[in-house]
A protein has these predicted regions:
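Predominantly flavin-linked oxidoreductase catalytic cores and closely associated redox partners
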Residues: 109-258
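Hydrophobic anchor at the start of a short beta-strand
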Residues: 21, 29-31, 150
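A conserved beta-strand/loop capping segment in the N-terminal third of enzymes
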Residues: 52-105
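Beta1/beta-strand and adjacent pyrophosphate-binding region of the FAD-binding site
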Residues: 2-14
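C-terminal helical "tail/cap" subdomain of flavin- and related membrane-associated enzymes
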Residues: 324-393
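N-terminal Rossmann-fold NAD(P) dinucleotide-binding loop
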Residues: 17-18
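Glycine-rich FAD pyrophosphate-binding loop
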Residues: 25-45
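FAD/FMN-dependent oxidoreductases across multiple families
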Residues: 236-322
Length: 393
């Protein structure tokens, strides 16, 4: 049995884990970043890197590589169940997730973090009800890794979160999705001009209820070769089957003529890959004695309201700042870590969060009626006053 000690151990080298490791290592903290897979590795995702995560990558010196590997989206075309359309301003990068995760893990290492890939964490070590490290399998050996703080960044439906009793599955909090890559998608060349001036499509349909379809050109050759990340995401695990989502996409593309035209010559170049995530209504406890929870494991996002990667990145920096504050105070208690984390992340009060959740449920329920998005998109296109009041400048 190998025993090692670090200031911070981070379980999971996805965006949240790697960004947290980079910030901590940059501040001089001894960080060990553990990842069960080997990079580069693929992961089902919409591949949209919005302003939030991009700002963190800029702060960590990683944005230039992202820029070179991405399509830059300038607008979104929204399409309703009846085929109503409007174009709205929306900016993000679109780079394949396997590239994003590679860039971020390499960035963490450049700043001084130690990365161990193909290292599977099998459990947490606790002493007097405080998390003090992890047990893992690495290169065929059982290892014991001790730390002052453990960051739990093992993704949605966190196995470590479940072992602590802080994450409980709630069907209405779950989102399930499928995505695949297509080539030769017929993009509107007046909107898709080059790598740095492109558009994406979001579709709302009776086929998804509370959810959406997307078509996003991705990577440096997305516009040139019509390479797009194509997918669907729906809310409420009990209402949908994973395998059914692909059928819904093909039915949608057949029902909306302009979408059908986009896929007349398109060829799928990857398998459909499925994924699940929890939204903020799951109510995951974010910290306890000796640990914090970040990224998808913390269930911090609301699809259609926030993007998951930016929420993950924000939580990563907040947890890094909280750890630094805890070390200065010599206090890694759950109460102190939670207070530091909340202050850094600017988490809303319970009252405000409850109101946000009510609005989220209202939005989701309204989307069961496709006429809601039909009318919304119609007004965005035809009513300048409505458009101005509902779109951020």
């Amino acid at each position: 049995m190998i025993i090692a000690e670090r200031d911070v151990i981070i379980v999971g080298a996805g965006p949240a884990g790697s960004i947290c490791a980079a910030y901590l290592a940059k501040a001089g903290v001894d960080v060990l970043l553990l990842e069960k897979d080997i990079f580069p590795r693929d992961k089902a995702c919409g591949d949209m890197e919005c302003e939030g995560i991009v700002s963190h990558m800029g702060a960590l010196g990683a944005v230039e590589e992202l820029d070179a590997l991405s399509t830059c989206i300038r607008n979104l075309k929204l399409i309703s169940n009846r085929g109503n359309e409007t174009l709205i301003p929306f900016e993000c990068y679109c780079a394949p997730r396997y590239e994003l995760d590679r860039i971020l893990s390499e960035t963490a290492v450049k700043h001084g973090a130690e990365l161990r890939q193909s290292c599977t964490v099998t459990g947490l070590i606790t002493e007097n009800d405080t998390v003090t490290g992890v047990r893992a399998k690495y290169k065929g050996e059982d290892v014991t890794l001790k730390s002052r703080i453990v960051m739990i960044a093992d993704g949605a439906f966190s196995s470590l979160g479940k072992s602590l009793g802080i994450a409980h599955e709630k069907p209405y909090s779950m989102w399930i999705g499928d995505r695949a890559y297509f080539k030769n998608v017929n993009l509107d060349r007046s909107l898709a001009k080059d790598q740095y001036n492109a558009y994406g499509v979001f579709g709302f349909s009776e086929l998804t209820g509370p959810g959406y379809f997307w078509v996003m050109p991705v990577g440096r050759d997305g516009v040139r070769d019509g390479i797009c990340n194509v997918g669907v995401m729906v809310n409420d695990l009990d209402a949908y089957r994973q395998a059914d989502l692909q059928e819904r996409f093909y039915k949608w593309s057949g029902n909306i003529p302009k979408i059908g035209e986009m896929f007349e010559r398109a060829v799928r170049i990857s398998p459909w890959e499925g994924g699940r995530m929890n939204d903020i209504s799951q109510g995951v406890q974010k910290a306890g004695d000796g640990y914090m929870v970040i990224g998808d494991a913390a269930a911090l996002t609301m699809p259609l309201v926030h993007d998951g990667l930016s929420a993950a990145a924000d939580s990563a920096k907040a947890a890094a700042l909280a750890a630094l504050g805890a070390f200065m105070a010599g206090d890694v208690s759950g109460e102190n870590l939670m207070n530091e984390y909340m202050r850094a992340y600017k988490m809303k009060s319970e009252r405000v969060t409850t109101e946000q959740l009510k609005l989220k449920r209202l939005l989701m329920e309204s989307m069961h009626d496709p006429s809601v998005m039909d009318k919304t998109i119609e007004l965005l296109e035809t009513d300048p006053i409505y458009r101005k009041s509902h779109l951020k400048r």
